[in-house]
Amino acid sequence: MSAVMTPAGFTDYKVADITLAAWGRRELIIAESEMPALMGLRRKYAGQQPLKGAKILGCIHMTIQTGVLIETLVALGAEVRWSSCNIFSTQDQAAAAIAAAGIPVFAWKGETEEEYEWCIEQTILKDGQPWDANMVLDDGGDLTEILHKKYPQMLERIHGITEETTTGVHRLLDMLKNGTLKVPAINVNDSVTKSKNDNKYGCRHSLNDAIKRGTDHLLSGKQALVIGYGDVGKGSSQSLRQEGMIVKVAEVDPICAMQACMDGFEVVSPYKNGINDGTEASIDAALLGKIDLIVTTTGNVNVCDANMLKALKKRAVVCNIGHFDNEIDTAFMRKNWAWEEVKPQVHKIHRTGKDGFDAHNDDYLILLAEGRLVNLGNATGHPSRIMDGSFANQVLAQIHLFEQKYADLPAAEKAKRLSVEVLPKKLDEEVALEMVKGFGGVVTQLTPKQAEYIGVSVEGPFKPDTYRY
């Protein structure tokens, strides 16, 4: 590693290639111009230094946009140590730029599972000893789980966790229910300016981009099956429809299924009469035999299971835009079928057996990103303007929890404060306003009479917590 581009003597990092730092810095500067909410918070709070004294363990995709988030946290007074939450999602030039700025980061694209866990451990440890961290910023919950299982003593100093994604929120809620969560958390995922931007509009932008980069296929006129119609599924379905695909949706939630119908998508099930009894006989082979592309979007396990994979049309593309690779039964694929790497993060999965394959045989599936996040494995993820809302939420959530000083409270008070909550709506609206300003939009202010008539403050919040946007 070159020491030329980093502060003298700084070695507290591991990235693929530190010489990529200048490239990364150029991209960071462009990203800043596309992240008005995040940069607005940086300007607004720089003088107050609300995160002075905060020591943040971060585990989120090490992209260019994350670089802007990291430098915003630092600009507001925090110290950070960073790793990526996915083995394929790091942009190496982004990691290099952050390392060159003297910020500890441990991430590179194409980590093994062992290297991934090692990188997380390096953020937790400094000079071989647990760092005196007092905040956690997580995406997916792996960092949170490692802290609870291997370093529980560190939780005594930690004021809280901010969690970015659906999967991580599910894990936090399970921990809270089971009595194993030791510190409060903010569910950033369900902030409106996160879920409606990142999950929906971000996937609308980045899914088709990733599939086209990975396969060079024309998508129009082909049939796609999107598994799940939550916010991610909604954006994904729109993304494929934009390409001219014939999109079908599979859902378990009647409300989401109804929304898919109302949006003009045919709601189908890969199982006969919607019943999965675990046998091949329960599969709707006639349906799956016509599907050219299957996308999982749920955050649940085995929603594209082994029997579905057996029944899929030859040469169908299979990918996931949820969080972990267990949405698709990749374990079955590894155990029973031969894998042929076409290029990084693109594999032909030969269904003719495990021990070998005929390269000219056409009974294969094309698996993208090994079943992990396709938009970050095969492309660069959501654009900066989308991540602006998500990361502005993260900054405000970190400030909010850090100000609460949970770790300093008496035991009785801690018991009352232990929860998983969404960011207060007023802060959500603050993020939204900065985003609107970034588009050059002008928001109309209520008159006092109008505000009184609908029972809100002129300054907001403007909707009750029960309002569904």
UniProtKB/Swiss-Prot annotation:
UniProt keyword terms in alphabetical order: Cytoplasm, Hydrolase, NAD, One-carbon metabolism
Cofactor requirements of the protein: NAD(+)
Main location: cytoplasm
Protein's UniProt name: Adenosylhomocysteinase
UniProt keyword Cytoplasm, yes or no: yes
Binding site for NAD(+): 165-167, 199, 228-233, 251, 300, 321-323, 375
Pathway: Amino-acid biosynthesis; L-homocysteine biosynthesis; L-homocysteine from S-adenosyl-L-homocysteine: step 1/1
GO CC annotation terms, alphabetical: cytosol
SMART domains noted in UniProt: AdoHcyase, AdoHcyase_NAD
Reaction(s) catalysed by this chain's protein: S-adenosyl-L-homocysteine + H2O = L-homocysteine + adenosine
EC number: 3.13.2.1
Compartments where located: Cytoplasm
